[in-house]
Amino acid sequence: AVDAFTSIKTDFFNAFEDLKQYQQSTKDWLFGYLSYDLKNDIEQLHSTNFDGLNFPELYFFQPKKLFLLKGDQLEIQYLNLCDDEVEADFEEILECQKSKVETDAMLKIQQRVSKENYLDKVSKIITHIRQGDIYEANFCMEFFAENATINPIEIFTKLNEISRPPFAVFFKNHKHFLLSATPERYLRKVGDLVVSEPIKGTAKRFLDPLEDEKSKTQLALDPKERSENIMITDLVRNDLSRTAQKGSVEVKELCGIYSFLQVHQMISTVTSKLDPQYSVVEVIKTTFPMGSMTGAPKISAMKIIEEQEETKRGLYSGAVGYFAPNGDVDFNVVIRSILYNQEKAYVSFSVGSAITSQSVPEMEYEECLLKAKAMREVLS
């Protein structure tokens, strides 16, 4: 999707109402994103942590041109079809030159929170859990580089060669870039069917097939990982029930194990049938931010996250996706992603893990480093 015919950009105030009006007035393809901090439009919450990226909280656009890959065929849709423009676009594509911008060879990636500080923060979250304030919290930390120059297309290509995820996204809005290799779907709607696929549970891949199978089996049977996943699956069930036809919410798969190039993941699938009195934007508002990136109970977890994290999440742990003209949607979860503000020469990526009463801070730290591995590789 390229070239904005119309667009909407806003902060968190009345964001979902503005999006609903925009979607219903255009009734066209819309592409864009929702930042994690739109939580402040849904609940009485705030975001005061450091923000080195300064992305808008919400941005969607109605494209002039749409390129749809269907199997081995390319379908091109133009908002206002003009034969001369189609020909000119094909010539431009064929003559397209590779960007001469090179990624800094000496890019210095820094960790926002030291290991010692991270372990202390996780211990504080565990104390909250043992006191009964929450059951689980998804705690994240940022890696960043200042005065940085990268080639976004080159980095995106490398990242997806390493990971080959199902919901990858390259998104450019002026000087803001998202290079995402996410394996997680947040929300899909087809007709009246709504689907959410939360990920909770991660295990390392190994080159040795026997060792790799052992890691996969251990993940499937790990009581802590299953507990994390089941808690979030229950939260998603509850969120979907708010806009669902009575009795239609189902867990289609619980704690399924899926293998990606870098890691094994535990994924559950929850579905519902949309009650006709609710719009698709209301489904998003009542399920956002996704439970896999907050914890449970959601509001209490988000408050504790804000206290302990040192970076504003922004688009990280938000969602990127589209609205189709018929009202269907598909959105991913922005994880395993690199964010780049070209104007500020600032590169950022964040990783996190679910903290429960069974968490060992050192192991949570190691899980974060495992998730950061692919992004560090492509940037270094």
Regions from the PLM with identified roles:
Residues 1-380:
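Extended alpha-helical targeting/anchoring segments
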